Amino acid sequence: MKAPFHSHPTSPDAADAAVYVQTNLVSDIPGLATVTDPHLVNPWGVSFRSGSPFWVSNQATNSATLYSVTDSTDVNNPVPVFTVNIPTTETGPQGPTGQVSNTNASSFKLTDGNLMSANFIFADLNGTISAWNPSLGTDGSTAHIEVTTPGAVYTGLAVNEAHTMLYAANDSAGTIDVFNSSFDPVDLGHHAFRTPGQIEARGLVPFNVTDIGGDVYVTYAPSGREAQTMAGPGDGAVAIFSESGKLEPHGVLLGGPHTPLAAPWGVAIAPDDFGKFSGDLLVGNFSYLDSEINAFDPKTHKFEGTIPIFAGSGQRPGGLWTLTFGGGGGDGSPSTLYFTDGIDGETHGLFGAIESVPLTKATQQLVQTMASFGSPSAPENSNISPHVDETSQQLLTIPQHA
């Protein structure tokens, strides 16, 4: 279930030589990952509380499932997997998308009568935002709808640092909808989270929203599922706002021929021990045509390189969603990048991990051995070999862009 990536073609003796290793943790496809879970189909949002397992939103099965990961890639899960149902509505698209956790005991209290704060909150394509806490039950319980916005299609969700405001990306309206700690709509002013002109001119709308350290990153994509799945380089952008919705100076990152953003959704800031891309802004492309992770200098927005995602033998890439680093308990390692992917055209699912591993003599020998297998299905400008066996290892060399 592991796939090593060269971070860049360099001598194995170079001080910064490293390999990025992908580990498939959970999939609905038997044999593709360490754990098989049929609920994990088109997984979107991921969140966790300190020490908790990962909570993963599964759009295609209207569920959230829990996976405990320790030591970066060790999945320790009961069978069956703990599952929470996300409520559906009678009409419109369905399924949970973005997800956040809440640790503020005074915020986001459920209105089902128990008046306890939500532990986890879910946005949905059906225009609802639902919430869950243990008072609703354990395995098999159902989250409670707290927000219903007619006509909305919520494709992403974020919470501010104080856990007192929610931000929801509304694909149908092209807006960021804001809610207070009582789940009531908030008007931050006409210009708050307004799509920058150079992004609006491209016909792009908010696709996801992520709060990282008090900076709110909004990713933009073409409106509508078909346009998003077929987006190419240039069909995407990122804008950085304050938590009050003010665009930050130099806060716009546009896609283009040398900035390969294609319907981007997931965003993360790499820690200082993540190899070549340490400290970089990582942006994941959802597009089926360019489903990959692109790294940028967080200050200059200079494009630094790409990490491809290996979807598995026989599976098509496409549908890359969350990027997040772990928390240090049952929520993985802070040095490991975790991702969700609706592989095979969002008909299946993958929850995986990417680590930066020093390119020691042993790993260099492994890389050389695997490289000898050739690359029958590699995309242009990359060097991708088939896996050594059905589920074990692959070599994906990060493309070198001009």
Which residue ranges define each predicted feature?
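Sequence/structural signature of beta-propeller domains
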Residues: 2-393, 401
